[in-house]
Amino acid sequence: MNYQQEFRNIGLQLMGNMDSEEWIELYKKLVYWELELSESEDTSIFEILKQQKIEANVQFSKYYEKNYQNWIRKESGNEPLLSHRLLSDKVFPHLKEDKPTFLIVIDNFRFDQWKALQPMVEEYLRVEKEDLYYSILPTTTQYARNALFAGLMPYDIKRVYPDLWIDEDEQGNKNQNEHLFLQKQLARHNMDIKTTYHKVLNVQYGKKMIDNLPNLMQNKLNVIVYNFIDMLSHARTESDLVRELAEDENAYRGVTRTWFAHSPLLEVLKFLSNKDVNVFITTDHGSVRVARPIKIKATKEASVNLRYKVGRLLDYNPKEVFAVAKPEDILLPRLNILSPYRSEEHTSELSHCQ
């Protein structure tokens, strides 16, 4: 089937009442055709796909807003897998096996980027299963990755571990306690195992990781976080040079492939390919390239993050944002008596787990 035939089917799906699994399958279709058509000389077909993807993003954002509160409170009965349940559902069951498990978390890593890298990964590893999960909101490292490692929503992290949670208005790295959150989650699941946690922020540390891999084979769980894709995503916004190198989504995937082909991460996978281990590759959240920014006016105390705003006296168009007056309603911590959250409506996204 070519895209011209698939176009009508996707259009009909978008007019229907899809559930979370059907949205995942639709997203997979759109990514498949985006990769297939990105090199096509027929730019008119690719433009049609881009418009269909924009429409899908709009509808998906509405779907997210309508269902999100029920999902996180498990009130719908058919909740998708969310960030805070990822490890307990997908990784922890494998820790009972008599072999080491390596969990590789690539910050801000999208599904289309994974599909672009998959052929290189499969030169060394066999992909046994590919799943997608839904990121919690806001889709930022501060919230999504802390939830992933803690196995709790941010509201509950602050409630249960107040000394470890760093609030929006506090100084310091908001993700500096991820390794402790992981230990706490393992303890809640009665898993007394040898675990290591590593955050790779530069090539030098990445190379040290390679040298240390033989020692990690003695542990039941080894977690390695890679931040390059997230840094690339931010540089794409802030640097003219990077913006030129990754001017569209196809070029962005190309930069990702180039990085991966020469990265210490690929060397890690090569090493693991000769060992009897479980390997999970996942992310904490994805990203969306915003073509039409939403204006939100706020006091100077409001958060500066581009994906969401929290603060007093926020002025915005309610049709353009997902607004929550009481943060605890979506299990986010309250900073003060007046701290509503506003998330741009057109930046919801799926995250994934391989």
Describe every region a protein language model picked out.
Residues 1-354:
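Feature captures the catalytic ectodomains and active-site-proximal regions of enzymes
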